[in-house]
Amino acid sequence: MQKAKVIVIGGPTASGKTALSIELAKAINGEIVSADSMQIYKEMDIGTAKPGENEKQNIKHYMLDIISPEARYSVADYKKDAKKCIREIVEKGKIPIVIGGTGLYIDSLIYEIEYPELEVDLQYRKHLEDLMEKEGLEKLYEEAKKIDPTAMEKISQNDKKRILRVLEIYHQTGKTKIELEKESRKEPEFDYKMFAIDMNREILYERINKRVDIMVEKGLIEEVKNIYEKYEKLPTSLQALGYKEIVEYIEGKLTKEEAIEKIKLESRRYAKRQLTWFRKNKETIWLNGENPISENIHIILEEINK
């Protein structure tokens, strides 16, 4: 039996993935599944560049606003939920379009990675928490880099949850996260066609800077304050890029201007890491983000109809 086709569009932040995916969905009777680890959170709209109702243009979107900011959500959870959405779209006779910049989420689908359910070793977790308290998250980041440099290329030095996961996997299995994932790959359920957007670095960085300014104008600081004040314990989601820096401003560790500049800098660094990630997949078909959307849609249609 022929597998259902699924179009995947990756690429760095601010490269125009959303606009392209919506126009593509309109052209091919598609529906969109988000692969963005921050857009899954409710209440976090501005800093995650979540598409609003007008922007969606009546195209159904899945995997947006599915959990509250303090909830835990793993890559395994994403894979299970996203596949359910993809099946639903296929059953309707429509074409699923997976779109986002979270490489871990995309890889979980296209490589059908089975994530081992490891029990949390509370004693070891406490040891890591104590070490972090004493020497900072940077120390754990460096430790994780020594153990699993390949996995750490894709993980931000602020991403406490994933840094701990790399260390805990190695502690419990004696294998790196990458080794474990390679052993856990299966034949994918769908026929995924992977596309990614790239563009001139200067233009991309300019777009990132502009986007951050627009987010601040739209009320990013107020959005972060609301979440910060609402939850007793600081949610992990506020460790995310664009939120963490505003928390530092709220706590008086940075001025407003410093926080904004830091978001721009970290976003540019993140874009660089995203591009590195997508380049690792040799089957990725690259689209030029400076081209008109219609041109990129034409390329996508040619490829999926081969």
Model-derived regions: residue spans:
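Phosphate/pyrophosphate-binding catalytic cores of soluble transferases and nucleic-acid-acting enzymes
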Residues: 1-306
